[in-house]
Amino acid sequence: MIIDNVYVFTPDKAFVKGGIILDGDKIRQVYEEKDAPQLNGDVLDGKGCYAIPGLIDLHFHGCKGDDFCDGDKAAIGRIAEYEASVGVLSLIHI
């Protein structure tokens, strides 16, 4: 799968137009438009979209009526599902 024509966030902390080549559930390559490889296979047009790395929420108490302090495993599951839905891959309760 290739996501092309998308703005990717670079290590230089800038967005550049380019694409992402996926190999299963792994990122194989991120490229700038000027260095785009020949696109074969499934190509998704990312026009108008931005791609950023997964985020880490360093200070989080809860959401949607659930709180870590409740100590409820089901609530923690709902919190984790919500965070994943908005691009957060890791979170810490302090």
Which stretches of residues belong to each language-model region?
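N-terminal metal-binding scaffold of metallo-dependent hydrolase/deaminase domains
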Residues: 1-37
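Short acidic/polar active-site loop segments enriched in Thr and Asp
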Residues: 88-90
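Conserved small/polar residues in nucleotide/adenosyl-binding loops
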Residues: 93-94
